[in-house]
Amino acid sequence: MGRLAVMTVWMALTLTGVAQAAGRPRYAVPAGFTRCPHATAWHGFFKWASQRDSSCAAVHRYMRVYAAHASGPRMPRHVAGYACRIHYWRDADGDIYASRNTCVRGRLVIRFYGMV
């Protein structure tokens, strides 16, 4: 009986962790990237940046240029020679509340999040 209780609790905790990981954005710096904690733009909407083969100062400048192009109904996918992939998170009503942008130009890669 004790073994069944332990297995039940273990499964509940494991499944809860998986559900939470899939639901909300999580700031993860991939291997080979450098975290840029002070790089923000658009009054803090764009934040949580990291870079590979660039510098945090360049990331900060790029995010400001990107923000200047982000005033339309859609997030831009091409800014300053970078091609950007965008992943969106939606709430229960289907409204976007966060995004992860991965922008690439040659070997340079900049990742940042947009959060309300």
Where are these regions (language model features)?
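Processing junctions and N-termini across compartments
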Residues: 30, 50-53, 78, 97
